[in-house]
Curated annotation (Swiss-Prot):
Pfam families: Ribosomal_L30 (PF00327). Part of the 50S ribosomal subunit. Belongs to the universal ribosomal protein uL30 family. It comes from Rickettsia africae (strain ESF-5). It comes from the Bacteria. PANTHER family: LARGE RIBOSOMAL SUBUNIT PROTEIN UL30M, MITOCHONDRIAL RIBOSOMAL PROTEIN L30. This is Large ribosomal subunit protein uL30.
Amino acid sequence: MNNKINNIKITQVHSAIGRKYDQRLILVGLGLNKINKSVILANTNSIKGMVNKVKHLLKIENM
C-alpha cells in the first residue's frame, strides 16, 4: 500500500481586498497573504475544503 501523501501547489493570483472576512481568514490559514505567493501543502480533505472556498482567488497545481 502506498502511504505517500500527494501535495498541491497553491498560488494566490487575485487580491483579498473587498472579499468577505472569512475568505481572507482562509487565505491566511493557507499561508497566503500576497499575490503570486505560492505554498506547497498536503492534499488532505481539510486543505481541499479551504481551497474550494477561495478557488476563484487561487491557481492550483498537483505535485
